[in-house]
Amino acid sequence: LYRLTPMEDAFSINAVALVNGKPQTLGLKAALQVFIEHRVEVVRRRSEFRKAKAESRLKLVDGLLKAIIDIDKVIKIIRGSDDAAVAKDSLIKSFKLTDEQATYILDMPLRRLTKMSKLELETEQKELKSVITKLKSLLASEESIKAQVSEELSQVAKEHGTPRRTKIS
C-alpha cells in the first residue's frame, strides 16, 4: 500500500546553516537549537541597544529639566554669548550640565526650548526610568530573555500561522 500510493513520501532538505560563522549541516533538533540561540542573542542585543538609547535620552531630559527651571537665565546666557563655545561653557558652569546636554540645548531652537513643559519632561523622565528598569531586569537573567523569545515566537505564530485543515481522530 505504501509503495503504490502517496501515503508515504520522502523529501530531502538542505539543512546547511551558519553556526558561529561556519557552515554546518544540521539536523532538525540542532537547527532548532541554533535558531533559539540566535533569537536569544537578537533579543539581548536589541534590549541593550534600546537601554542605551533610553539612557542617552534620559541624560538629555535631565539636562532639559535643569535648564527649564531657570529658562530666562538660559536664554540670557545664549543671547549674551559671542559664540556657541562660550555659551556652551557658560551653560555647563551655570547649570552643571554635561557637554552633551549643553550641546543639545544649544542646538535646539529657542522657541522650542521655551515651549517645553516641565510636566511633560518629568513624565518622559519617569517613562524612561521605567523602560530602563524593565530592560535591565530583562537583561539580568537568561530565563527572562528566553521568556521574551517565547512570547515573540507565539506572537509570530498567532499572526502568521494557519489553522490545521484536517481533523485528528
Place the predicted regions along the sequence by residue.
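C-terminal interaction appendages of subunits in large macromolecular complexes
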Residues: 2-169
